[in-house]
């Protein structure tokens, strides 16, 4: 005969809801979104920090390549211009107007003393499709190209010893070191529009930089008018501005800057028997 289940053997919870209610699902999704946002912030910061570190490595490598070039060639390379596709760009004439050329003239005048790192001339990588060295942000914008500025010291007028063939040896270290118009590097914290000839009231980090190599950082594509004075001080690409700003990243400054002092340059060339 059929077996009949007693009431004690049947489901004691006939009204139990199977699965989650909409309210419970919403609470779970809210918790997940909060956890994701908490995790995402450190990850974003880590990615940004890694890009800064990588950019610093690239800039330091570039500085070593520049020193190596100076040791082998007896001079510093001129910066690349916006149209020289990663190759050093010069002026045909040592004075007056500048007709650009990629052929080294005897006077050594650079067409863009504050231009781009000449990655093709130096043989370094990584580079963009036009041959310009790039920082670690690599979003395809021209602003991601690594910048490079070189001292335009003249002796005599119309001759640029630091970038002329064997110009450093010819001009002598004493003459070059005695000049007061090499590149300046200032500490961050500018409260007024930066000068183009000195650090003004800002702390001076160097008055004898032979070259400055730098990246405009994460916000390199931001309109210059939106940047603080510290970053504006590094924006005069193509000009004869000899003043730059360097410091740790903060809320208004994220440029990555290093420089090559005359003393280090001279020391490395002396070690290689290229000077005096």
PLM-predicted stretches and their roles:
Residues 1-20, 47:
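N-terminal leader/signal peptides at the extreme start of proteins
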Residues 16-46:
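N-terminal single-pass transmembrane signal-anchor helix
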Residues 45-276:
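N-terminal pilin/flagellin-like segments and related low-complexity appendage regions
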């Amino acid at each position: 005969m059929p077996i009949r289940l007693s009431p004690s053997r049947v489901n004691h919870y006939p009204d139990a809801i199977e699965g989650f209610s909409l309210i419970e699902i919403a609470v779970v999704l809210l918790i997940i979104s909060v956890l994701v946002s908490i995790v995402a912030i450190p990850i974003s910061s880590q990615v940004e920090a890694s890009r800064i570190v990588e950019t610093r490595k690239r800039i330091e490598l570039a500085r070593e390549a520049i020193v190596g070039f100076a040791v082998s060639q007896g001079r510093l390379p001129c910066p690349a211009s916006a149209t020289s596709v990663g190759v050093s760009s010069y002026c045909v004439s040592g004075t007056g107007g500048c007709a650009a050329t990629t052929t080294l003239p005897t006077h050594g005048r650079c067409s863009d003393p504050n231009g781009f790192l000449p990655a093709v001339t130096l043989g370094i990588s990584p580079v963009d499709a036009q041959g310009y060295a790039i920082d670690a942000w690599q979003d395809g914008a021209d602003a991601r190209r690594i910048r490079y500025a070189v001292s335009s010291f003249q002796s005599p007028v119309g001759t640029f010893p630091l970038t002329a063939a064997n110009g450093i040896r010819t001009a002598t270290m004493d003459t070059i070191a005695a000049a007061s118009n090499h590149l300046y590097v200032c500490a961050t914290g500018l409260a007024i529009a930066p000068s183009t000839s000195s650090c003004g009231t800002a702390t001076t980090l160097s008055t004898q930089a032979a070259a400055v190599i730098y990246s405009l950082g994460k916000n390199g594509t931001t309109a210059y008018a939106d940047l603080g004075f510290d970053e504006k001080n590094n924006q005069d690409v193509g000009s004869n501005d000899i003043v730059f700003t360097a410091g740790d990243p903060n809320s208004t400054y994220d440029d990555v800057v290093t420089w090559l002092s005359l003393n280090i340059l001279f020391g490395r060339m002396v070690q290689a028997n290229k000077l005096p």
